[in-house]
Amino acid sequence: MKGTAPARRGMLEGTSNPAKGESMTDQETPERAHVTADDIEAANDLIDFIEACPSMFHTAATIMAELDEAGFTYLPENAAWDIEPGGRYYTQRNTSSVIAFKVGEDLAATWGEDGVAGDYHFQLTASHSDSPTFKVKAVPELDGAGETLRLNTEAYGGMIDYTWFDRPLALAGRVLVREGDRIESRLLATEREVAIIPSLAIHMNRGVNEGFAPNRAVDLCPLISAGELKQGDFDALIADEFDVEPEQILGRDLFLVNRQDARIWGWADEFIST
């Protein structure tokens, strides 16, 4: 998981004003008056949510936990649903998608006494639980130059390829683990960066500043070892994360993650970068 965002996130109290030699809050600084304390609080809440959700599986788990806390009732998709007026419910699919809904209080007025739809309406809001990234393939390793080892990945979603270069990257997603006669779906988010997609030195790619169209199958496969790891070691490393044997790992959906701390920035703290 990502670490706590830097102190700048909460830069409300004690803002220095060199011109007046005094300390102010955002509300008292004229050039920053449009960014309020409520704005900063909402931005920090958003940052906390994003950092808790490095994969679609973490996003679904986070949302379901918040729905439970808010009093929503979970409805298994494969069971009969008993819906009551005024009820609040949610269901999930594949542990990566969540659907939550509220039911009106007066259903008789909505449908009418004769069961014919009357003033029936609903409001719908939808959002992605995932984001563009690189997914680790079923065969996870590729031999690189010399003794190096690369991660065998495929593009997931529409992304701007060049933004992935030269960033230390972690792994996040879900892993299916056999425990006795059960199969458990477990979340994984490495606490450290384990891969990087390196740029070539400019003397090896003189035209890089004139237009570079990287080959995803060649240029965008991350480096994961300078010689310590060999073919077949990746699944053993994942097993170590759960303190299980490699043969207990039955499947995985793992993605590259940028663990750089999210932050609020700008002269008026009006931007968020994640």
Report the location of each language-model feature.
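Basic polycationic patches enriched in arginine
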Residues: 8-9, 32
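Short intrinsically disordered, low-complexity coil segments enriched in acidic
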Residues: 1-7
